[in-house]
Amino acid sequence: MQAFEPLMPKGASIINLSSLAARDGGGGGSALYASSKGAVTTFTRAMAKELGPKGIRVNALCPGLIGTKFHDDFTKDEVRTIVAGKTPVRREGRADEVADLVLYLASDKSSFVTGANFDINGGLAFS
């Protein structure tokens, strides 16, 4: 980020992608993935502190189970059903719902929001 920070105008917004796995460790065999996403959440907070005085906001999304091609290809249907059933909203998230949050964070409507890691998981886990 430091390499392109001088090119970013005041009021710019950086949106990182983390994961619910950053907090709960992910599923079996995903220790490295979960650890890397944990680093993203901490990096987001650190960069928010560094870049905030320059007028640049930094936030991250921490999605849970979002219906994507990745899950179509690599997550068993029965696992998806179980996880979706554990959310208070009783379903998987959709990519367009994640995109809506990205649009909000990129807009001036979120001009006082920085250093936040947003859970977008249907209530499966709360911050």
Label the predicted regions:
Residues P6, K49-P53, S111:
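Alpha-helical segment proximal to the catalytic Tyr-Lys
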Residues T87-V98:
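A conserved structural motif in NAD(P)-dependent oxidoreductases
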Residues S19:
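Residue(s) in the substrate-gating loop at a strand-loop-helix junction
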Residues R23, C62-D73:
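Short, flexible catalytic-loop segment of classical short-chain dehydrogenase/reductase
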Residues M1, S36, T44:
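Active-site helix of classical SDR
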Residues G25-A34, A46:
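Active-site loop-to-helix junction immediately N-terminal to the catalytic Tyr of the SDR YXXXK motif
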Residues L103, T114-S127:
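Short C-terminal tail/terminal secondary-structure segment
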